[in-house]
UniProtKB/Swiss-Prot annotation:
Its main location: cytoplasm. This is DNA-directed RNA polymerase subunit Rpo6. HAMAP family: RNApol_arch_Rpo6 (MF_00192). InterPro entries: DNA-dir_RNA_polK_14-18kDa_CS, Pol_omega/Rpo6/RPB6, RPB6/omega-like_sf, Rpo6/Rpb6. It comes from the Archaea. It catalyses: RNA(n) + a ribonucleoside 5'-triphosphate = RNA(n+1) + diphosphate. One of its GO terms (molecular function) is DNA binding. One of its GO terms (cellular component) is DNA-directed RNA polymerase complex. Pfam families: RNA_pol_Rpb6.
């Protein structure tokens, strides 16, 4: 998996949690009663968040 800075990680998880909260489908099986933030963290840990980071060269 690609190595992210703590700022990139926070932005990715936060953006994905917002998407999930607004109705986007969750791409992994999460326990019943999980919050959008918990679902986003699980997706991040499994490496399947559909967000790309582009760094300047």
């Amino acid at each position: 998996m690609f190595r992210y800075t703590r700022f990139e990680k926070a932005r990715i998880i936060g953006a994905r949690a917002l998407q999930i909260a607004l109705g986007a489908p969750v791409l992994v099986d999460v326990p019943e009663g999980s919050t959008p933030l918990q679902a986003a963290i699980i997706e991040f840990e499994k490496g399947i968040i559909p967000i790309t980071v582009i760094r300047p060269s």
